[in-house]
C-alpha cells in the first residue's frame, strides 16, 4: 500500500510503514484516512513506523501520528534518524502517550 503526494511518500510493507520526504501540509485528512486503513490492514500486533527518511513533519503531522497511535490497539516501534534534529527532539515525546505500547529505536 502506498500513499504519496508532491514531496512525500508513505509505504506499507508487511507491518512496516516507511515515511519519506517532507510532510508539511495544513490538512491531513487523506493522510489520516491512509493511516486508519493501515491500522485495519496490518494484522500483526506490532506496527513499525520508520521515520528515518522523513526530512520534515510539522505539528499537524505529529498530531496525526499521535492520533493514529492512540486510536490503535497495536504496539508501535518508532524508528528515527538521530542525525535529523527535529526527529531526535520531537519524536521521543510520543512514547509518553502510551508508554507500554510505543517504543523508540534509532
Annotated model-derived regions:
Residues 14, 44-46, 73-75:
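A general structural motif
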Residues 25-26, 55-59, 85-86:
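Short, solvent-exposed loop/turn at the beta-strand->alpha-helix junction
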Residues 34-38, 67-68:
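A generic secondary-structure signal
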Residues 64-69, 73-106:
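Amphipathic, Lys/Arg-enriched alpha-helical "gate/interface" segment within cytosolic domains
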